[in-house]
Amino acid sequence: SLTEEDRMKSLEIVKSLIASYKKPLFLAGDMNAEPESDFIKELQKDFQILSNPEKHTYPAPDPKETIDYIAASKQNATGFAVISARVVNEPMASDHRPILVELRTAEKADKIFRTKPYLQNPVGNGITVMWETTVPSYCWVEYGTDTTRLERARMIVDGQVVCNNKLHKIRIDGLQPGQKYYYRVCSQEMLLYQAYKKVFGNTAQSTFSEFTLPVADTESFTAIVFNDLHQHTNTFRTLCKQIQDVKYDFVVFNGDCVDDPVDHEQATTFISELTEGVYGDHIPIFFMRGNHEIRNAYSIGLRDHFDYVGDKTYASFNWGDTRIVMLDCGEDKPDDHWVYYGLNDFTQLRNEQVDFLKKELSAKEFKKAKKRVLIHHIPLYGNYEKNLCANLWTKLLEKAPFNISLNAHTHKYAYHPKGELGNNYPVIIGGGYKMDSATVMILEKKNDELRIKV
């Protein structure tokens, strides 16, 4: 339109069409009007200018005026954010300079969740909820003893809410052991995160799940222990069928389950397989490292997917009147082996655990426990080669009153009664990932009796 009158009539036609559009509507082109004109002022009543009117667009060789615009209807202007807006330095292609606006559109609410939530670290009257989204998000957990009166938990570090990320870890503390809690996770997409401007998209809410922390004096529980799955989905699903009628309280993955992680996507895919397979949205899971979790390009990144007890890959905690001690053996070859390229120092990690074991074995919680369970990936007894931890740990453990040690790594099921190999406690070693050798352990504590079924 070359005249103001024609432009105004054209604008009326455009406005009459807006009401029928439910999605974001954009208007772009040569409007033959400068920013202070009556036409642009009238346009801005219903449209938001997305391009930068302070940058001239015409004539292309030496711009003196701004007459080209990209605008969005205000009626549906919440489904996107402007990332950048600029005039392209191109004086020859046309008599107008091209203008470019980069937008980020909002994801649909039902596409925001990448994974279901899974529970971690159910100790110290608290629990951690983790999940992943497909887009950067601001997240929180809504929880309570019933679904009509909910509190909100967020991840706050040094006074700042952790957000604008895809992998989410939120701790809920101050919980009452023995009390059933209901919770759901909420994720609101963050379309723009700038110093002085934030733009939010749609919000996704999960369905409600539930969990219950064990009371301090509980005498009965059931735990499931997997090992050496090596990302074999069919093996894992077959083992899950073996325990489908078992009601269990927590799950342990005793190493080499998420083995040799290549990248984030691969790790997320199999972790989701594991957590969903054991109903990790309401049954807490402990992930332990084997030597294969330490290998490949994403091995360091794998840590972000878990919430370790005490923020260490080794730990101890009580489940009722039973003490659980978990150790991390590290790699199965010396640090100076050529395959590690000088990038490992598991000698230091093993020595740290010497101090940890000394404190643990003399701790009140350990001494007062009715039963004591030791779990680590590489066996100290019954391994096909010497465990690199043996010289450091054996003397501490040979008199420790553990009732059982649950191990893995050899890919061959074995049971070694107390004393058979100089072991001060019975040792059970889980099988491998092949269908004919795979095992799953059921650890059952009833009153004063501790049973293991493999």
For every predicted segment, state its role.
Residues 1-109, 191-193:
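Active-site regions of metal-assisted phosphoester/phosphodiester hydrolases
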Residues 2-6, 150-162, 190-202, 222-237, ...:
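Acidic/histidine-rich helix-loop elements
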Residues 2-4, 31-38, 59-65, 231-236, ...:
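Active-site environment of divalent metal-dependent phosphoester hydrolases
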Residues 4-41, 137-139, 246-250, 278-284, ...:
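His/acidic metal-ligating clusters that form di-metal
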Residues 40-63, 67-72, 167-168, 384-448:
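Conserved beta-sheet core of the metallophosphoesterase superfamily
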Residues 76, 95-97, 102-225, 244-246, ...:
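Acidic, histidine-bearing metal-coordination/catalytic regions of metal-dependent phosphoesterases
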Residues 186-210, 265-362, 392-401, 414-433, ...:
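Extended active-site neighborhood of metal-dependent phosphoesterases/phosphodiesterases
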Residues 219-297:
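Conserved, compact domain cores that house catalytic/ligand-binding motifs in diverse enzymes
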